[in-house]
Amino acid sequence: MSEKTFLVEIGTEELPPKALRSLAESFAANFTAELDNAGLAHGTVQWFAAPRRLALKVANLAEAQPDREIEKRGPAIAQAFDAEGKPSKAAEGWARGCGITVDQAERLTTDKGEWLLYRAHVKGESTEALLPNMVATSLAKLPIPKLMRWGASDVHFVRPVHTVTLLLGDKVIPATILGIQSDRVIRGHRFMGEPEFTIDNADQYPEILRERGKVIADYEERKAKIKADAEEAARKIGGNADLSESLLEEVASLVEWPVVLTAKFEEKFLAVPAEALVYTMKGDQKYFPVYANDGKLLPNFIFVANIESKDPQQIISGNEKVVRPRLADAEFFFNTDRKKRLEDNLPRLQTVLFQQQLGTLRDKTDRIQALAGWIAEQIGADVNHATRAGLLSKCDLMTNMVFEFTDTQGVMGMHYARHDGEAEDVAVALNEQYQPRFAGDDLPSNPVACALAIADKMDTLAGIFGIGQHPKGDKDPFALRRAALGVLRIIVEKNLNLDLQTLTEEAVRLYGDKLTNANVVDDVIDFMLGRFRAWYQDEGYTVDTIQAVLARRPTRPADFDARMKAVSHFRTLEAAAALAAANKRVSNILAKSDEVLSDRVNASTLKEPEEIKLAMQVVVLRDKLEPYFAEGRYQDALVELAELREPVDAFFDKVMVMVDDKELRLNRLTMLEKLRELFLRVADISLLQ
């Protein structure tokens, strides 16, 4: 069977840059699935994406589905005919479904009996006939949150469509996709190359688009070119470009023919905190900032034009003129804000609502101040500095700079606090209170910052859960999942001696009578333990290991982490599987018994050597392991408990627990309960699979 290259290109208006990669990757994944489901043999499916096009190129696509031999077994002969040999309704219905009559069916004989059988040779459908629907289906499944309609048509897509190119080899596949009749016309760059041209063969793509249309359709190639050219441009001025992945992706999605240029701004603007300048360059203008080798911002930036100009200096000057007013604004705001102390913004916090039922930002500030001081006392941080940081924590939200450049919240608080002469750990805490902002982000660097970051997040968690507005489905407007995970990460990775129970109770107490949810403390803790489950699954821990620890509901995050590591290590021991099974057996035995057990085992009642030996070892280990549990040495404790495998196995092999002798039965049940309690000091080992 011959093979050909298939090309589909959808020419559109400018596509959303932040969604371009996901649209192209989904298009490729959807179409690959369509090919596989149709049984069409094919080679590599390569995707292309530029601001005004999505395209796929499929190598070695078979021209038709393979022919198939199908068999459909019908009713058994005994059920297919009545006593007179007439076909039953079941046989006739089956035959109708196969498109034949009963007398046309074959018979299949096996050692288990005889059945009606339908065999057929199904010729594979041509690829040409299948492709239009496959393309349409793949496009319909794209992850587009908001569709748009254009003109008088009822067609919906992410952006208006102008061209649809469908080529199988050198042949146009006739189809109407998204309201456009397919042909071999492709549009080039808006301002360079040929605005429109025809493509003779799918194999010519994307080279023909580069040569005649001045468009680099390969997304990864454009991105790599921008990165390499920007690095070289920065090197030429003795610096390093800030090529953050997210901005690099966005810029690659904005240009069809990237031309990297270097511009500059006035050095006087370097007196403004670098974060504000960078926010303007990256966020507003999509420029790449440039840093010196010592990490200081240089008065230069790198940008990407979408055109080759005969006079690039004109483009450079234009961009310099555009950015200058923005930098001047930042300079003005910075100088204006510093004319008063950060603390002077406190009264204005009373004018901003945190949440309708929970009060203003000033109310939140008072709670954070108190909670940060309480946390600082628990973890050995400077209480005065923590409460000071809490008092100032939201003041920068009232500054001109943060009002204009919202992403500078926190960092501007740090700069203004330093200007006011606040303690360094207080200033740093104002910046780091929002950390970690995302998975893998840095944690607060000092104890005061940790106290403030935890206080801010716990106040939000307690308040929102306290009025019954916990996250539902994908909706989490107050970012409570991120807040909970942030608290857990700080406590675990900084090894802080904090208990979620008392921490949550204190956060709730500070709200006074504002909260309406009577179960708020338990709800917050359960929610945070649920975040633990997700965290440890991402870390590669098995679900049953997590469940074994969660069953004990440890509310000290550092303690939870120690238990997780201990159970994970325990699973590597030879005795683990047997002891997990034994714990499950003990758990089941105890669950079925409703008898009241004694507080201790009566040694004089024990009879069998196996139970005497096990009872003695349980007593010895109970005393030996008490300091282990007190110190959180759970891994060492489980290693010691692994030594119980042999006596536990011997006990269950030789000793009957549920005997008629009540005193003996209760004594044995008590011993098993004491055995299980030892393991439960760490986790519920019976849940391990």
Curated annotation (Swiss-Prot):
Supply the EC number(s). Answer: 6.1.1.14
Q: Where does it localize?
A: Cytoplasm
Q: Single Gene Ontology BP term? A: glycyl-tRNA aminoacylation
Gene Ontology cellular-component annotations? cytosol
Q: What class of enzyme is it?
A: ligase
| Superkingdom of the organism of origin | Bacteria
Subunit structure comment from the entry: Tetramer of two alpha and two beta subunits.
In its UniProt entry, what is this protein called?
A: Glycine--tRNA ligase beta subunit
Q: Which organism is it from?
A: Shigella flexneri
Which taxonomic lineage is given here?
Bacteria, Pseudomonadati, Pseudomonadota, Gammaproteobacteria, Enterobacterales
